[in-house]
């Protein structure tokens, strides 16, 4: 849902078309390393995560809605501040939180209202992730990003269970904040996540958000 006429990959492609200038040793400058070039291309591609607004909020008429990156950042903070849990790698949770929606830099924020199946959504995102990792270059970092994304997508570890819960907690917390700030009623976000939390932490944090919502409603 980026506003630019060129896709993020188009932009990176244009950048990659230029040839590295010949820099003489007399100038005192050295040409940028290929790894630095790939890193900056990848980060440029990720820029749209900061500018693409989350579809669910747009569809509900929220003014100035959060971006995809906003959402992932607070999930990262959730993973940072959560207490130690048995057999859960908190550092892995932080990494997973900041990459779980990274493919949306290309495909955008696909919401249920778009009428796209979960299988097709996953296929598009995986293809986008492969393209992004090609930009970054094959190596340990690309493999780590793909592994983290797949683990989250498959919900195949305790870390993925927790981060998926944080995805929902962050959403309902944001919904509560928008209800307070903009006078909205955003029941659908709370209804769609009810009884879907997998971890004790997720259930406890969601219960706290819901309790605050109930209290806020009663005090009006």
Language model segments and positions:
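Alpha-helical, largely C-terminal catalytic domains
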Residues: 1-220
């Amino acid at each position: 849902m980026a506003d630019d006429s060129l896709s993020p990959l188009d932009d990176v492609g244009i950048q990659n078309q230029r040839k590295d200038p010949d820099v003489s040793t007399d100038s005192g400058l050295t040409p940028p390393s290929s790894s630095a070039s790939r890193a900056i291309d990848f980060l440029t591609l990720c820029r749209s995560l900061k500018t693409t607004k989350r579809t669910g909020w747009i569809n509900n008429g929220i003014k100035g809605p959060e971006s995809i990156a906003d959402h992932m950042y607070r999930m990262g903070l959730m993973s940072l501040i959560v207490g130690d849990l048995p057999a859960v790698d908190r550092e892995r949770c932080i990494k997973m939180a900041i990459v779980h929606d990274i493919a949306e830099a290309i495909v955008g924020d696909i919401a249920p209202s778009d009428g796209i199946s979960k299988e097709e959504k996953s296929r598009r995102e995986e293809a986008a992730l492969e393209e992004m990792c090609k930009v970054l270059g094959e190596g340990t970092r690309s493999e780590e990003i793909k592994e983290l994304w797949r683990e989250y997508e498959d919900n195949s570890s305790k870390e993925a269970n927790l981060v998926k819960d944080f995805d929902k907690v962050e959403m309902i917390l944001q919904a509560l904040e928008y209800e307070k700030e903009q006078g909205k009623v955003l029941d659908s976000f709370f209804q769609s996540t009810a009884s879907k939390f997998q971890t004790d932490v997720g259930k406890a944090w969601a219960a706290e958000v819901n309790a605050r919502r109930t209290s806020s409603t009663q005090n009006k």
